[in-house]
């Protein structure tokens, strides 16, 4: 359990957090129409008559959206409901042309599941925790109001209207902003592995409604508020902290928390009231008369299960077990599906090597490649160096052609030019030398130039050995084999 507490005037307060995540389904078409679901089109260019709620237009469920939701439910270890139904959620807003949203209140497609978050001592998560998922249902997204096009008017863009969403509702099991952040990162990772949502919060394809309440430890749950449409993990964590502190101040000041919907203002780092929170009866839910219940066949469910990829937890266990990777490396490499794919392509290019080479490959990817990509501001799928080239570079180190220092030089040239490492080594004369005669000659020069330090070393100052190694390597332009240098220095220095 989290040790996170808010220190108030009357003592410590525990924070109770639940998240409702809206994840846009990856599909070519919308949930009930054939209009494109792609992001970025000009306003109102991806709108069918169904999306615009023209009279007489009937919705037809998109099987691919249902398939993606079922696979996501399976990835969460959740119960798949073979029978589910669509309901109408009735409310008026300018970006909702139908006057209602087609959702699933009473009989969702997916039942209870779980998400496991890892221990992270730096973030205050002392041990791995399992967070309950209450349900997953599919629903339509609304359109978008545009307030920056005219000084006195707002415009409506219906491109997003009718796009399929999965609403993934957690149980109120989280107790700190860090746990909420870890939950969202893990959920986003799972969605990307499945391929059901790209998890791009900046484009709005994944957003979170944040439910927060506070209580004294052991007390019943307090009254919760819901902060709507938070579009980054960092903002979710900040909104939780801000809202929890606000609630403590209100209660300790003699006030009461009102169940309401709030908005988070990242510029001021505070939440503000948007409207009183509605209950289900306020929306007058009833079964959608235009849609039959969804009944999934055994064959359809089995096909969805067969299409599931290896998920991050299973892949991580395999990396640790079969490849012998350290737990940290395995966690980093499996946290993002693109990173895992790149690493596996690297291993394939290296001829599916044993544990020693796999470990070296993971270290190189995490330290050298990640460092370079961060410096360049690129994602791993935009890497200037391919997995094949990475495998060739590692092979040149393994066979002694390159030292670690030379390999770093070659890698920098690869980043700049895109050339293969073997060609760079050949053209620039960067091959490591193990010529004992040449190395002995340089060692003799280094010792002659540093006779005082030789005397100190032979007098017992063993730490000076590293100085002689460094001077020798420097004199040879980093091309000497470090192992041979060490061996010859030990023999020469005595």
From Swiss-Prot:
A Pfam family matched in the record: GatB_N
GO molecular function, one term: ATP binding
Superkingdom of source: Bacteria
Gene Ontology biological process terms from the UniProt entry: glutaminyl-tRNAGln biosynthesis via transamidation; translation
Enzyme class: ligase
Entry EC no(s): 6.3.5.-
Keywords tagged on the record: ATP-binding, Ligase, Nucleotide-binding, Protein biosynthesis
Catalytic activity: L-glutamyl-tRNA(Gln) + L-glutamine + ATP + H2O = L-glutaminyl-tRNA(Gln) + L-glutamate + ADP + phosphate + H(+); L-aspartyl-tRNA(Asn) + L-glutamine + ATP + H2O = L-asparaginyl-tRNA(Asn) + L-glutamate + ADP + phosphate + 2 H(+)
SMART domains, per database record: GatB_Yqey
Role: Allows the formation of correctly charged Asn-tRNA(Asn) or Gln-tRNA(Gln) through the transamidation of misacylated Asp-tRNA(Asn) or Glu-tRNA(Gln) in organisms which lack either or both of asparaginyl-tRNA or glutaminyl-tRNA synthetases. The reaction takes place in the presence of glutamine and ATP through an activated phospho-Asp-tRNA(Asn) or phospho-Glu-tRNA(Gln).
Subunit details: Heterotrimer of A, B and C subunits.
Matching NCBIfam families: gatB (TIGR00133), PRK05477.1-2 (NF004012), PRK05477.1-4 (NF004014), PRK05477.1-5 (NF004015)
Family of the protein in this entry: Belongs to the GatB/GatE family. GatB subfamily.
Protein name: Aspartyl/glutamyl-tRNA(Asn/Gln) amidotransferase subunit B
Organism: Rhizorhabdus wittichii (strain DSM 6014 / CCUG 31198 / JCM 15750 / NBRC 105917 / EY 4224 / RW1)
């Amino acid at each position: 359990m989290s040790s996170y507490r808010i220190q108030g005037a009357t003592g410590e307060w525990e924070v109770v957090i639940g998240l409702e995540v809206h994840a846009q389904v990856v599909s070519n078409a919308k949930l009930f129409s054939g209009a494109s679901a792609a992001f970025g089109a000009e306003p109102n260019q991806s709108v069918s008559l169904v999306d615009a709620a023209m009279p007489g237009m009937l919705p037809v469920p998109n099987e691919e959206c249902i398939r993606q939701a079922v696979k996501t439910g399976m990835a969460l270890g959740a119960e798949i409901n073979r029978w589910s139904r669509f309901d109408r959620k009735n409310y008026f807003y300018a970006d909702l042309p139908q006057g209602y949203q087609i959702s699933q209140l009473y009989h969702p497609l997916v039942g209870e599941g779980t998400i496991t978050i890892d221990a992270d001592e730096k973030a205050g998560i002392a041990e791995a925790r399992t967070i309950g998922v209450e349900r997953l249902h599919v629903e339509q997204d609304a359109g978008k109001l545009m307030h920056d096009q005219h000084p006195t008017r707002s415009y409506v863009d219906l491109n997003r209207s009718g796009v399929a969403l999965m609403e993934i509702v957690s149980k109120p099991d989280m107790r700190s902003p860090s746990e909420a952040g870890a939950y969202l990162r893990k959920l986003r990772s799972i969605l990307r592995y499945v391929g059901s949502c790209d998890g791009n919060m900046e484009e709005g394809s994944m957003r979170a409604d944040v439910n927060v309440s506070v209580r004294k430890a052991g007390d019943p749950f307090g009254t919760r508020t819901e902060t709507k449409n938070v579009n980054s993990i960092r903002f979710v964590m900040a909104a939780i902290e801000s809202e929890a502190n606000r609630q403590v101040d209100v209660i300790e000041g003699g006030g009461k928390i009102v169940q309401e919907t709030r908005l988070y203002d990242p510029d001021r780092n505070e939440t503000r009231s948007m409207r009183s929170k509605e209950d289900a009866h306020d929306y007058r839910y009833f079964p959608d008369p235009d849609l039959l219940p969804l009944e999934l066949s055994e064959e359809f469910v089995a096909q969805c299960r067969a299409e599931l990829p290896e998920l991050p937890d299973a892949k991580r266990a395999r990396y640790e077990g079969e490849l012998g990777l350290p737990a940290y490396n395995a966690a980093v490499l499996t946290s993002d599906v693109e990173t895992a794919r790149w690493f596996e392509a690297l291993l394939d290019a290296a001829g599916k090597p044993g544990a020693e080479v796999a470990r070296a490959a993971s270290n190189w990817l995490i330290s050298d490649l990640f460092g370079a990509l961060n410096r360049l501001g690129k994602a791993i799928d935009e890497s200037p160096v391919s997995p094949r080239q990475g495998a060739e570079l590692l092979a040149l180190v393994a066979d002694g052609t390159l030292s670690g220092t030379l390999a770093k030089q070659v890698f920098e040239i690869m980043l700049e030019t895109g050339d293969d490492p073997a060609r760079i080594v050949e053209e620039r004369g960067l091959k490591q030398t193990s010529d004992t005669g040449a190395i002995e000659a340089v060692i003799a020069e280094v010792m002659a130039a540093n006779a005082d330090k030789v005397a100190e070393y032979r007098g017992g100052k063993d730490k000076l050995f590293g100085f002689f190694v460094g001077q020798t390597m420097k004199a040879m332009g980093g091309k000497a084999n470090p192992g041979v240098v060490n061996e010859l220095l030990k023999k020469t220095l005595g």
